[in-house]
């Protein structure tokens, strides 16, 4: 009966997320519609039950990223994290950089033998942030790949093992740096 369907909806709402309840009720409503087609004399008990469920999307909390000058640590990981912070580039783009990609005033994001780009429009140049200049001077002295250890042969991907250390050390994922850069650019327009 309709009362049973309403009671079931209430029971689900006590135990599950409202959006999950809506999905389950929509599935049951579809099944009940088929039943009503096969037996025209039956009543559709699930029709309209979803209309009274309000789904409130939780707002993501704002992430505060500490300034790189306060980061603790050294080595390849921290160098890559600084590049991510100041460029907004993708992790694979930075992890697969070559010394030849570091010019005096900009960083070239371009495909190389081991690292294709995500899309054809990903090829670009990024101005060098003043706080990256000293690091770039040292890195420019290298030959070939800047961080060859970041390449994973089995998956043919760059920087795949950096997400967890980044989250653990800095409280943000590599993608979070890219999102932050986009937000900063939008707010400065």
Predicted segments with their positions:
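Short, basic/aromatic-rich helical patch in the C-terminal catalytic core of site-specific tyrosine
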Residues: 5, 28, 32, 94, ...
């Amino acid at each position: 009966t309709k009362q049973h369907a309403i009671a079931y909806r209430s029971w689900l709402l006590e135990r599950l997320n409202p959006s999950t309840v809506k999905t389950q009720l929509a599935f049951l409503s579809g099944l009940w519609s088929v039943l009503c087609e096969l037996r025209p004399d039956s009543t559709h008990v699930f029709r309209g039950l979803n209309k009274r469920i309000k789904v409130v999307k939780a707002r993501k909390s704002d992430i505060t990223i500490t300034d790189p000058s306060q980061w603790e640590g050294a080595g390849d990981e921290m160098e890559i994290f600084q590049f991510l912070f100041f460029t907004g580039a993708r992790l694979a783009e930075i992890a697969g950089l070559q010394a030849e990609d570091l010019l005096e005033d900009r960083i070239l994001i371009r495909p190389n033998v081991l690292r294709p780009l995500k899309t054809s429009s990903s090829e670009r140049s990024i101005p060098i942030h003043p706080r990256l200049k000293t690091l770039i001077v040292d890195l420019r002295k290298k030959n070939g790949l800047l961080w060859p250890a970041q390449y994973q042969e089995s998956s043919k991907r760059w920087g795949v093992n950096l997400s967890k250390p980044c989250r653990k050390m800095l409280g943000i994922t590599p993608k979070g740096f890219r999102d932050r850069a986009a937000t900063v650019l939008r707010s400065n327009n």
